[in-house]
Amino acid sequence: MSAIPAEESDQLLIRPLGAGQEVGRSCIILEFKGRKIMLDCGIHPGLEGMDALPYIDLIDPAEIDLLLISHFHLDHCGALPWFLQKTSFKGRTFMTHATKAIYRWLLSDYVKVSNISADDMLYTETDLEESMDKIETINFHEVKEVAGIKFWCYHAGHVLGAAMFMIEIAGVKLLYTGDFSRQEDRHLMAAEIPNIKPDILIIESTYGTHIHEKREEREARFCNTVHDIVNRGGRGLIPVFALGRAQELLLILDEYWQNHPELHDIPIYYASSLAKKCMAVYQTYVNAMNDKIRKQININNPFVFKHISNLKSMDHFDDIGPSVVMASPGMMQSGLSRELFESWCTDKRNGVIIAGYCVEGTLAKHIMSEPEEITTMSGQKLPLKMSVDYISFSAHTDYQQTSEFIRALKPPHVILVHGEQNEMARLKAALIREYEDNDEVHIEVHNPRNTEAVTLNFRGEKLAKVMGFLADKKPEQGQRVSGILVKRNFNYHILSPCDLSNYTDLAMSTVKQTQAIPYTGPFNLLYYQLQKLTGDVEELEIQEKPALKVFKNITVIQEPGMVVLEWLANPSNDMYADTVTTVILEVQSNPKIRKGAVQKVSKKLEMHVYSKRLEIMLQDIFGEDCVSVKDGSILSVTVDGKTANINLETRTVECEEGSEDDESLREMVELAAQRLYEALTPVH
C-alpha cells in the first residue's frame, strides 16, 4: 500500500525540540498537510554554545515554511540569528514590531556579555545584523497567509510586544500562547482571550499549579525588602534582563522613591549596556501598552524616570554607601549582575532580590537554596553572606489564570510546554482532575518530552465552492453540476473552463489532433461500415473533398491514397477516434470486406416511395386512424391524444406541445422510420 501524500494526510504532528518538560530553548515544530511551522527558536540560559540550542538536528531546516517568534526573551529567540544565518532555512519569519526592535539590542547584549570563547559563539554581531533583513513584522490581529497557512496574533501580556499566535491550516486552528500573563500590571495589558476557539492549545506551564500572590502584596513586599537593605547601609542588587520585567520594577521603584523623601539621597541605577537604547524603545512603543500608560503619556512619559540613573558599565560606578542597582542578565551567568554579585556577596548588609523565574543550572537558581559559599567566574570560592530574597515578578500565568484561560477556550487538545518536568506533571494532573467529571467538555492533555511527538488526527470535510459562470444560476434539487475542480492550498473550487483564467493562473487550451491513415478503398464503403457501427455519420464536403462527421466530433476527410482524421483532444473524443481508426484499418487490410462490400447505388431514396411505405407500416403498428400526412414532408402519429411528427427528410421525430413527456412513443416511431429507411435503401 502506497504512503498517503503529506498534503492529503489527516495526521497533525507537534514535536518540541526545546521547552518539552523544561524551561528554556523554546522551539516547537508543527506539521500538517505537508506544511511545517517552527514556533520560537530560543537558547537554554543554563547551557553554552551548541549545547544551548534546541534539537535542530532532528529536522531539515529547508523544509520549514514558516517561523513565528512570540517575544524577545532569549529562551524564545536567542537561537534565531544562528538558525537564519547558519542553516538551510529558506522560509519566512515573523514577529511583532516591538519584538523586532528589542530583539536587535537584546541579542547584541547577549553576544557581548557571553563568557565563552569566540569559537564557541553561535553567531556574531554581523550575523545578528544580517538576520534583521530576513525578519518580517506583523501587527496584532492582522491576518497573513504563507504557503496556505493563515495566521494572526493576539496580545500576550508578559513583555512588550509579546504575541500569542493563532494558526489555521486546512480549517484546523491551533493557538500557541508563548509566554503569557492574564494579569494586567503597571505597563502591560493582560493577555487577550481569543474569540475564536482553537482545536489545539499549546500553552506554557512555567508555574504549574502555583498561585501567584496579589500584585499589591508582591509590590509592597518588594519595596519593603529594598527599603530594609538600604536602611541597614547595604547595597541592593536586582538581577534582571535588560528588557521586560526590568521596566515594571523601575516603574515601581521610581514611584516608591517619589513617595519616600528620606530615600532621595540613595541612588538607583539601571545597569545595562543597553539601558539607553532599551528605554528609547519603550518610550516609542507606549501604544502597545495598557490604557493607564497610554493616558499618562499625554501628560508625561512614565519611562522618563526621576530617581533612576543609567549605568553603562562598572567603570562609571562610584560604589560608595547604600544604593540599589538593577543589572542584567537576570540569571547572573555573566555580565554586570555577576560582577556586582561577586563583589557584594561577602557583606551581610547587602542583599540580592531574585525577581524573575530562574532556570536550573544558573547561579540565580543556585543561590535560592542559600548555599554557604559560591564559585566565582574565575573559580574562586567566596562565602555567601548577603541576604537572598525571591519575589517573583515573572509575568507568567499561575494555575488560576491557566485554568480560566482553558475553560474559556475549551480546546479538545491541550499541549503543555515550557515547564519543569514536575511542575508540568502536576499541572497536567490538575487539569485532568478538573475535567474528568465534566460530560460536556472533553479535553485531552499532553506533556511531551523534547523530541517526542504528539500525533493527532483531524479529518476535515472537503467543501468545494462553485464560482464564476457556474454560480450565476441557483441550482435545482437533483441537478448535476460539472466543471473543473481546482485546489488552491486547502480550498477547493469548481469552475467552468471559461473561468479558469479569471480565478486561477491556469489557461484553457485545446489540442487539435490530426492523424493520416493509408486508405485506397472506396470512400462510400467507409461511410457504410461506419454507419453500421454508429448510425451517427454525416456526409460533408470540406474544401471540395468528400468528408464524414462521425460521433459528431470526428472528421474523416478523403485525400489521395489516404484519409485524414481530425478531432479536438479529450478523453471521449480520443476514444471515438480510436474506434474510427480501427474501422478504417480493418476495411483497408481485409479483402473480404471489400469483395463482399455492399455499395450504395443511390445516395437518396425516392421520397414518395419511402413516405407511402412508412405510412402503411405505421398504420399496421398503430391503426389506420392514427396516421396522417402533413404537407408532403411530415407524417403524424397520434396515440391516446399524444402526437409525434416525423420529418421524412431527416427521419427525426418530435412530439407536439403537451406530448413532450411521452418519450416511449417518440422512440418507437423513430426506430421504425430508421429501420424502414435502411431496409429500403437500394443496394446491389
From Swiss-Prot:
Modification(s) after translation: Sumoylated on Lys-462, Lys-465 and Lys-545, preferentially by SUMO3.
Enzyme category, top tier: hydrolase
Note on how the cofactor is bound: Binds 2 Zn(2+) ions per subunit.
Tagged with keyword Membrane: no
Phosphothreonine found at: 681
GO molecular function terms attached to this record: 5'-3' RNA exonuclease activity; metal ion binding; RNA binding; RNA endonuclease activity
Family per similarity comment: Belongs to the metallo-beta-lactamase superfamily. RNA-metabolizing metallo-beta-lactamase-like family. CPSF3 subfamily.
Binding partners and assembly: Component of the cleavage and polyadenylation specificity factor (CPSF) complex, composed of CPSF1, CPSF2, CPSF3, CPSF4 and FIP1L1. Interacts with CPSF2, CSTF2 and SYMPK. Interacts with TUT1; the interaction is direct and mediates the recruitment of the CPSF complex on the 3'UTR of pre-mRNAs. Interacts with WDR33. Interacts with ZC3H3.
Name of the featured protein: Cleavage and polyadenylation specificity factor subunit 3
Protein's gene: CPSF3
